[in-house]
Amino acid sequence: MTLILKRVQLLKDKPRREAIDRFLRQHQLSLEADCEMAIIAEYQQRLVGCGAIAGNVLKCIAIDPSLQGEGLSLKLLTELLTLAYELGRSELFLFTKPCNAALFSGAGFWPIAQAGDRAVLMENSRERLTRYCRQLAMYRQPGRKIGAIVMNANPFTLGHRWLVEQAASQCDWLHLFVVKEDASCFSYHDRFKLIEQGITGIDKVTLHPGSAYLISRATFPGYFLKEQGVVDDCHSQIDLQLFRERLAPALQITHRFVGTEPLCPLTRNYNQRMKSLLEAPGDAPPIEVVELARIEKNGGPVSASRVRELYRQRNWQAVAALVPPGTLSFLMQLAESEHQTA
């Protein structure tokens, strides 16, 4: 059997991108927008397999059923892994259905979290997550009430600072994690810097760099799940399972703090699932979820989405009422640079 494997730059090769999307849809899958490159397999001038890479995640992997059992899956995965390594991406993840886990195990992937029979998260290392948790454990602090916040801060607002202040005042120590993925309006580097500036003067807080084990909803692949509600549920289950069973025990976290969410139904539903999944009895110690009411200014809750809208309007007076000086300065400089390049 003569197979031809080809690399496709999805952002440049529109005809092949459309062909891959059609092939995936024939198999009840879809090609997600963040996919950068793909490997396709052709047999007798017919597309019979594909796999794509987005950041450090392998996804959109499918094989024509008529050729399953011919070793095509392993060939495709091997080529996809070679591409990832050439791009300098050695720490890889993939999400798939549990029924496919054995296939990927044969290519060197291990399961690290699972949402029932619907989704499993795998990575190409048996020890990497354990090593990361050992590194986290070096930042343990003494105390009976150890808190955590996971923050996107897109961008950092006075509401974020208030949440950190309140949580820190209620704990013996607070661990603050930043969502790492660059799937927000502002880069991870900029968001981390604004948080670092914004929490100046708040005691008993450790700011942790972003981690691939804090799963962003924006980058969670749902190409193999048909309904949006199922995608959201699987994301929260996998993300919160990793937090409760691996990250939190490393730091002996007992409480997780969130702000109330009056504006975004998606985040509000996530907070509800968080309470259910973190507080339920289980093998790992339960974590109490503490929901703090958002502060309000000028007739509405202080939120990053509100700041982004005011930023687009260049309403600096209104922005200044909602963000610390560091965020305001950053946004004004960003607006100036955008104006100069326009």
UniProtKB/Swiss-Prot annotation:
EC number, UniProt record: 6.2.1.22
Source organism of this protein record: Klebsiella pneumoniae
Record's protein name: [Citrate [pro-3S]-lyase] ligase
GO MF assignments: [citrate (pro-3S)-lyase] ligase activity; acyltransferase activity, transferring groups other than amino-acyl groups; ATP binding
InterPro entries: Acyl_CoA_acyltransferase, Citrate_lyase_ligase, Citrate_lyase_ligase_C, Cyt_trans-like, GNAT_dom, Rossmann-like_a/b/a_fold
Keyword Nucleus appears in the UniProt entry: no
An example Gene Ontology biological process: biosynthetic process
Chain's gene name: citC
Stored PANTHER family: [CITRATE [PRO-3S]-LYASE] LIGASE
PROSITE patterns linked: GNAT (PS51186)
Entry-linked Pfam families: Acetyltransf_1, Citrate_ly_lig
Broad class of enzyme this protein falls into: ligase
Catalytic activity: holo-[citrate lyase ACP] + acetate + ATP = acetyl-[citrate lyase ACP] + AMP + diphosphate
CDD domains to which the protein is assigned, alphabetical: Citrate_lyase_ligase
Function: Acetylation of prosthetic group (2-(5''-phosphoribosyl)-3'-dephosphocoenzyme-A) of the gamma subunit of citrate lyase.
Entry-linked SUPFAM superfamilies: Acyl-CoA N-acyltransferases (Nat), Nucleotidylyl transferase
UniProt signal peptide: none
Keywords for the protein's UniProt record, in alphabetical order: ATP-binding, Ligase, Nucleotide-binding
